Design a protein with these regions (language model features):
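Bacterial N-terminal signal peptides that target proteins for export
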Residues: 1-13
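Bacterial N-terminal signal peptides
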Residues: 10-22
């Protein structure tokens, strides 16, 4: 009843806020979406673009692409990073009254009702270093505010605020966290990412597959699910409280069983020892037993590979039919790696005094998707595919990646191996925001995009560039505001929607990518799996017999058609192929040179907040600026209410 009363009051003030921002009149002006001059020379005229069927496009992509690099970052909604990118479906793409969640309720510290809309933060607020807003399943579900099956996207501020002050007047900290959920950044904070969007293909309708935090995203990027098949095959494994229960489908950040104190094996896989120290150790998840890309990538060698599993009876029980089907499929094995900072020795081990445990101290165990699967962790052949971040750069420099190609996931961690420091001189920031995987609360956004740029530069400088597809995307939306209601694909054991969640950015970089393109195709994390399936002619995970059995149970018992991997048989999941340029694929235009993808070292080695590199230098005018909309943070805004509690924090 309280929430409904708030909604009514917000509706009464919405038009006033929209008018104050000047949206109704300003949006009549046409937006400037043309590429910058250095990009314009690489545009292919429409007249030179051949018409290709889907089959022809796929055949050409298969001819040209052998290496897939997935630079997998953490915790950013599309609107929080690209909501004002010209040409994208963003915050100001339509009048505020037609934009879901544009005006939201927030409680003032005196208990009165206020309203809040999205607002820009930048270098003046040290926007590269923000605290972590809540993105657990329960609170993200509340933020989406689903009524009658439709996500209203209008409780991002209130649900965040109520986490810290569930009843009565909110504390200042609670209100500041609610405000933080509505902040967005642009090319003055992450100019390198905007540079990639300007030069290559930006997808603006990719959703996080699961409503929840990081672990689900790191499972779905290799499995196109987080355990709905396991839930169907083992109903007793289901959770009822997604935030606190172990179980299927995975919707929280419990650590993998393998490597944990409960791991029964003699040769334990890597783990960050901090996870199980102190009074509040990480919970430990169930062994994951459904199919993932590492199985289908093994091809006809899979029946032999799985004989190396030291706990085959339990690890393989739910994929026996899958293994046989993949083995009989006849395709050759495709190699893969998961490179994650801290998994093995890194150059920075033991350097930072906060990393007292040395090796694995920068490792974020619950971000390593493959480690959750016993058939990977307990199989020395599979387990050998898991490496550290420095190993990735060494492999590129040494040219030691497999000659036949493969799929290579790349992730940062709690630290950064290049010794970069945040631009904000505050002691707490210098101590706590050294990470490079873009996760608020410990990563610096500028350090994180520098890591991505180093990875792209290294690929561009390597022998692999001419056959590469680089996908940059994020594992979840952080709990930050995004205005686009996600498709409704799956519902969990307690009836909550679990798929899809809010949008995340996705960028495609390749010699054959479209230039200065915004791709509106709808998809989610399973789109990456679907692309890999298509490129290497793998059987979709959704087509495997054990997964089909789970889907059948879902239809009969739960009356849901999509309880299985989402890389096939599920609507609204693109294969990403529309981001490739038909003219370049067919030879009517030259492939993009490596220099076009490279970011100059002067922009990578020094952070934008130091050099001043941003929108003006890029030559990009964000949509809000084009429309004459100049938002300011609330008077009591604090980008770090937890790290630096204060009445105001950094304001600008």
């Amino acid at each position: 009843m309280f929430v409904r009363r708030l909604a009514a009051l917000v509706g009464a003030t919405a038009l006033g806020l929209v008018a104050a921002l000047g949206l109704v009149a300003a949006q009549a002006a046409p937006l400037r979406t043309a590429p910058t001059p250095d990009v314009r020379a690489y545009l292919v005229p429409v007249a030179r673009e051949p018409g290709l069927t889907a089959a022809q496009r796929l055949a050409l992509v298969r001819r040209h692409i052998k290496y897939v690099f997935v630079l997998y970052q953490e915790n950013r909604s599309f609107d929080s990073y690209f909501g004002t990118y010209p040409g994208a479906d963003g915050i100001y793409s339509r009048p505020g009254v037609a934009t879901p969640g544009f005006v939201q309720p927030i409680l003032n510290t005196d208990g009165t009702l206020g309203t809040i809309g999205p607002f820009r933060i930048g270098p003046a607020q040290f926007a590269a270093d923000t605290d972590d807003v809540d993105h657990s399943h329960d609170i993200l579900f509340r933020k989406m505010d689903i009524e009658a099956g439709h996500a209203l996207m209008d409780h991002f501020a209130l649900a965040e605020e109520r986490k810290y002050s569930p009843h009565g007047k909110p504390s200042l900290k609670a209100k500041q966290f609610g405000e933080l959920a509505m902040a967005y950044e642009d090319c003055d904070t992450v100019p390198i990412l905007w540079r990639y969007a300007d030069r290559f293909a930006l997808y603006d309708h990719i959703f996080q597959e699961i409503v929840g935090p990081s672990t689900p995203g790191n499972l779905s990027i290799i499995a196109a699910q987080t355990g709905v098949t396991q839930w169907m095959l083992h109903p007793a494994a289901a959770w009822w409280d997604a935030n606190h229960d172990l179980g299927e489908p995975v919707a929280n950040d419990a650590d993998p069983l393998w490597g944990s104190p409960r791991d029964p094996t003699a040769h334990k896989i890597a783990v960050n020892a901090h996870d199980f120290a102190g009074a509040h150790p990480y919970p430990i998840q169930l062994n994951q037993t459904y199919a993932s890309l590492p199985l289908t990538l093994a091809g006809r060698s899979l029946p032999g590979v799985v004989t190396q599993d030291t706990r085959a009876a339990t690890d393989l029980a739910d994929v026996r039919q899958d293994v046989a089907a993949i083995g009989h499929g006849g395709h050759a094995a495709v190699d893969w790696r998961w490179f994650e900072e801290g998994f093995d020795h890194e150059p920075t081990d033991s350097v930072d005094p906060t990393d007292a445990t040395g090796q694995h101290a920068s490792y974020i165990t619950h971000h390593n998707g493959p480690q959750y699967f016993g058939y990977i962790a307990n199989n020395p052949v599979m387990r050998a595919k898991l490496r550290g971040l420095a190993d990735f750069f060494a492999a590129l420099k040494g040219g030691t990646l497999p000659a036949a190609g493969g799929v290579f996931y790349v992730k940062g961690g709690y630290d950064n191996i290049f010794g970069l420091k945040p631009a904000d001189p505050a002691a707490a920031v210098q101590r706590r925001f050294l990470g490079d995987d873009d996760h608020p609360g410990y990563s610096d956004a500028e350090i994180s995009e520098a890591m991505v740029a180093r990875a792209v530069n290294a690929i561009a400088a390597s022998r692999y560039w001419k056959q590469a597809a680089i996908i940059i995307t994020w594992d979840d939306s952080e709990g930050d505001y995004d205005h686009v209601p996600p498709p409704a694909l799956q519902y969990g054991p307690n009836g909550d929607r679990i798929s899809d969640g809010p949008r995340v950015p996705l960028l495609l970089i390749s010699p054959y990518a479209r230039v200065h393109a915004v791709v509106h195709a709808v998809g989610n994390h399973a789109s990456v799996v679907k692309f890999v399936d298509a490129l290497f002619a793998l059987p979709p995970l959704a087509s495997l017999p054990d997964e089909l059995e789970g889907r059948k149970i879902g239809r009969l018992r739960f009356h849901q058609a999509n309880l299985g991997p989402e890389d096939a048989l599920t609507p609204d999941v693109t294969d990403l192929l529309s981001g490739f340029d038909a003219a370049r694929l067919s030879g009517r235009a030259a492939p993009l040179p490596p220099s076009y993808a490279e970011t100059p070292a002067r922009l990578v080695d020094r952070l934008p907040a130091v050099t001043g590199y941003g929108c003006k230098a890029l030559g990009i005018v964000p949509v809000d600026a084009q429309l004459g909309i100049h938002t300011t943070p609330p008077a009591d805004f604090n980008p770090r209410p937890k790290t630096e509690p204060s009445p105001g924090g950094h304001r600008g």
